[in-house]
């Protein structure tokens, strides 16, 4: 088989295609969750924090003060931008929780489908098994 033929066989296997679809859908889903966090959850958090949330929280190393993280970075001052890290952790936690709920729901549906499926009918014994059963019964007598 040629190199291109091997690659085509590899790329068209079910697992690779499923993985590609999963990555694409996962990227789109990540954007949805990020929007949910940025546009719906963080405004509520900012009500209690009194500002725009965590993203712009930072600590400047030194005696200077800056009104925003962008201005501190522009000045080239070393900063400890802990707010962006906290925001990323919140995004990840919400994304992981939503995915967990989706997987849990899918597993529950799968269990219900398996429970609702009729039990398989036992197969008829083969002629060989019937003959062996008859021989066993004759030997017992």
Curated annotation (Swiss-Prot):
**Entry keyword Cell membrane:** yes
For this UniProt entry, what is the primary localization, expressed as one broad class?
membrane
Bilayer-crossing regions: 16-36, 83-103
Which InterPro entries does this chain map to?
Answer: Mechanosensitive_channel_CS (IPR019823), MS_channel (IPR001185), MSC/AndL (IPR037673), MscL_channel (IPR036019)
GO MF assignments: mechanosensitive monoatomic ion channel activity
What is this entry's stated membrane topology?
A: Multi-pass membrane protein
The cellular location(s) given in this protein's UniProt record come to:
Cell inner membrane
Which GO terms of the cellular component aspect does the record hold?
A: plasma membrane
Xref: Gene3D superfamilies: Large-conductance mechanosensitive channel, MscL, domain 1
| Signal peptide from the UniProt entry | none
Q: Which UniProt keywords apply?
A: Cell inner membrane, Cell membrane, Ion channel, Ion transport, Membrane, Transmembrane, Transmembrane helix, Transport
The answer, when asked if DNA-binding is one of the entry's keywords, is no
Report quaternary structure and partners.
Answer: Homopentamer.
The job of this chain, per UniProt, is described as:
Channel that opens in response to stretch forces in the membrane lipid bilayer. May participate in the regulation of osmotic pressure changes within the cell.
Q: Which HAMAP family match?
A: MscL
Similarity remark: Belongs to the MscL family.
Protein name per the record: Large-conductance mechanosensitive channel
**Species the sequence originates in:** Cytophaga hutchinsonii (strain ATCC 33406 / DSM 1761 / CIP 103989 / NBRC 15051 / NCIMB 9469 / D465)
Chain's gene name: mscL
């Amino acid at each position: 088989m040629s190199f291109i033929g091997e690659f085509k066989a590899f790329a068209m296997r079910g697992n690779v295609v499923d993985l590609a679809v999963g990555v694409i859908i996962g990227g789109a889903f990540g954007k949805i969750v990020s929007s949910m966090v940025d546009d719906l959850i963080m405004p509520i958090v900012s009500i209690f924090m009194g500002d725009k949330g965590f993203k712009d929280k930072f600590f400047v190393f030194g005696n200077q003060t800056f009104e925003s993280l962008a201005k501190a970075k522009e000045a080239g001052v070393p900063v400890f931008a802990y707010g962006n890290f906290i925001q990323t952790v919140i995004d990840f936690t919400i994304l992981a929780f939503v995915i967990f709920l989706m997987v849990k729901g899918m597993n529950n549906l799968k269990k219900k489908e398996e429970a609702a499926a009729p039990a398989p009918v036992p197969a008829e014994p083969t002629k060989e098994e019937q003959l062996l059963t008859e021989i066993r019964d004759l030997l017992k007598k």
